[in-house]
Amino acid sequence: METAMTTQQGLNEVVINKVQRMIENKAVGVQATMERLVNEGKIAQDYIAPIGVELRRNDHSPIITFSENGHVLMNMQSGQYTLHGNAIGQLADKMGIPSRYLRQLASGDEWQRQLAATVLNEHSGWTQRTRVLIRTVGQQVRGVLSDSYRRLNSVEILTAFVQEASQQGAVIADAYMSDTKVWAETILPQPIVV
């Protein structure tokens, strides 16, 4: 019985050491991810923008327009924004433009980017959709969603998750953030003895 207990303790130590090394090896990436999340959370803005045929019927000029200046740009009252590839695909979807076609135009030569801006201006003026939710981070549009989309704050959600996990004894083992995704993985650093 004592040999089995010693073997189990040895296995537990191996697991603990392996988990600790994994946590230490990923600590820099986890820290960078969490800093990026907080920093981008400070500059993220959501706008509800009216678009479509309703504006035309009521003789209103467009609230958002598109132009080309090295990139396809979205112009709003709050400023001029570059379009992330994700936003271009979502704009295409919302306005009934083939997504692949619009992405190719937006990343092409100057004449193609100008054509992309023209296509977006025409479609945004005639779409049956009346409003969209625009998510910006700094001077870049990252997402164009339905105006009924439930807006969630990733900073608050991930912070609450990490705090609760920490109260349960867990630590962040890995984390990742791109322009459109964020996730964090937690682990209990001590094995659970059964």
Locate each region found by the language model.
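Intrinsic disorder/low-complexity polar-acidic segments
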Residues: Y149-V194
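Feature for intrinsically disordered/low-complexity regulatory segments and propeptides
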Residues: E2-A160, E164
